Every structure is written in structure tokens, then in C-alpha cells.
Amino acid sequence: MEINALTITTLYIIGISAEGMTGALAAGRHKMDLFGVIFIALVTAIGGGSIRDVLLGHYPLTWVKHPEYIILICFCALVATKIPRVVTKLETLFLTLDAIGLVVFSILGAQIAIDQNHGFIIAVAAAVITGVFGGILRDILCMRIPLVFQKEIYAGIAIIAGAIYYSLIIWLELNALVCTLLTLFIGVFARLLAIKYQWSLPIFSYNEEK
């Protein structure tokens, strides 16, 4: 089963818009110029999907096939630079949008793996790569340890979303739209709970004794 084109497009636009704005804000916190802001926004929004497509041999890359998405991301980045205080005050909204973006990208990653007849493990891996690697690249370019590696249950949500989506659409053979909506609801709800209650994985701290 495949998600219909309209659903894919809608989800993708939501995802890249949210991630583009969060990327722009991250660049602003590090006092980057306009080129830096736009570049970080682009990397955040389409970096994970690009890595996934290269690894899976899925061509052309989505933004190459639809360059209008680049324009949309640039626009969202510019909007974020004009109203940073408004965006910051709407923290709850953007945390929600970020959660939606994470789960949306995870669903799309899993679906592309499914379209290529890959199994469960590759579908979940594609979900994680699509969902979190844009943020990893963003943090590396901003010269900080990626948040996904140290504080938050972020990759875990991508794993859960990919696993749920694959299970529903392949093993239970439910309608694609139903699978998408269920995965989106569960994934976003879990992510927001993790933020509210500050859930995190155990931290490994090692100090070498001299």
C-alpha cells in the first residue's frame, strides 16, 4: 500500500516548514549571517531525507525533483529571522511543529523503504535517518554536540514511529491514510510527553582515573 500523493505532499510541506524554521532559529542563536541562516535551515529540513535517498539509491532526490521546496524552506527561514521573538514566544507551538516534523519525516522515510521492498529493519532505519539526521547535521554545523545524542528521546520517537507505521501497513494491512494518522498521533503524543516530563535515556559518563 502507498500513501496517496496529496497526503505525502501535505506531510512533507508541514515537515520541511517546521524544520526550516527551527534550523533558522538555531543559526540565529549562533549569530550567523543570512547565508548561514538559510543554509542551516536547508540542511535541517532536507538533510536527513537526502542522506536516506543516497543510502537507499532513491533518485532523484526529493528537492532535486521539486526545487520549489527549496524556495519554501528559504521563505520559512526568512520569516523566522523577521519574527524571532514571536517564534520564541510560541515555543509550545513550535515544539509541537517540531514533533510533527519528526514523525512526518519518519513516516516518509519508512514509506520510501517500503516502496523499495525493504523489510522491517531497513524501514525503521530509514525512518530514523530521515527523522533525525537533519538535526544532527544542524547541530554539528553549529558546533555543538547533537541533542539527539545527549538529552532527549528523539531518535527513539523516530524508531517507534517507523516500527508502528511498518507494522500497521505491512503486517496488519490497514489503509495507508489510517496508518499515517495513527502513527502521527502516537508519535507526536509520545514526543510531547517526553518533552513535558523530560524523559531521557540513561547517560554514560566516564572519567578516566589517572
From Swiss-Prot:
Its main location: membrane. It is found in: Cell membrane. It is a multi-pass membrane protein. InterPro entries: Gly_transporter (IPR005115). GO terms for cellular component: plasma membrane. Signal peptide: none annotated. It comes from the Bacteria. Keywords: Cell membrane, Membrane, Transmembrane, Transmembrane helix. The chain crosses the membrane at residues 31-51, 60-80, 94-114, 117-137, 153-173, 175-195. The keyword Cell membrane applies. PANTHER family: INNER MEMBRANE PROTEIN, UPF0126 INNER MEMBRANE PROTEIN YADS-RELATED. Belongs to the UPF0126 family. This is UPF0126 membrane protein Cj0593c. It comes from Campylobacter jejuni subsp. jejuni serotype O:2 (strain ATCC 700819 / NCTC 11168). The lineage of its organism: Bacteria, Pseudomonadati, Campylobacterota, Epsilonproteobacteria, Campylobacterales.
